[in-house]
Amino acid sequence: MMKKGLLAGALTATVLFGTCAVDVPGIISPKTAEAASQLTDGIGGRAYLNSNGAILVTKIQLPSSTQVSNGTAYIYSGFSGGTESDIGFQYSDKYNVWKPYMKVGSKGQDQVQYLEGGSQFTNTKGFRPGSTVQLTIYKNLNGNTRATYWGTNNAGYNGRLISEISKTNVGSISKWKALATVATTGSRQSIKSNFSTSFTNITIDNKAITPVIDTQDFAKVTVSGNSVSLSVVKN
């Protein structure tokens, strides 16, 4: 389960790390220099995806090993603009799995409905470390925001998870994003982290999108074509 304090306070407005300390309005130029700002309430790397489209598809390579202390690891995408969203994975150290995570605007994980696969990818189960998951995010599907995950759980089950938050009614957005972060409600100085991930074959509305590096805060972000790799390392 998500730590209750994680979504309270400062994170309520910023979602997780959906916005940085210095806001970047609208479309980001590919010539924009990598931001020097720190992420709020944690550390990590972020790339923006210059598209205001409706459907994102990507394959995410989950870390085979995740070493994090004094914080919670996340790997996620989502959209920014009129509504901020974080959609992807939260690491469970207790079960050594990556659990589905979803937040859209003010609606959080407690309002997620699992339309398929909930018993195979939630509670004590989740996505297997080291596996590849295909993630599809629908910004607005009949007034709802939906995420579809195709992957393998920690018991070896291969299948689909469909998660949805209803009545989000998302309108226009300015961009999408890809992040790997460690969030904390305490001091960011105390965080220790070592994990890596990648988003490959990123498309939005069936068009390949080249990520633009935004933030590297105790992180290394590398772009290749329509793919991006992120490593979050802090000793």
UniProtKB/Swiss-Prot annotation:
Q: Which Gene3D superfamilies match?
A: 2.60.120.1270
What InterPro entries has UniProt attached to this entry?
YrpD, YrpD-like_sf
Give the signal peptide range.
Answer: none
UniProt xrefs under CDD domains: YncM_like (cd13427)
- Stated family: To B.subtilis YncM.
Name of this protein = Uncharacterized protein YrpD
Which organism encodes this protein? Bacillus subtilis (strain 168)
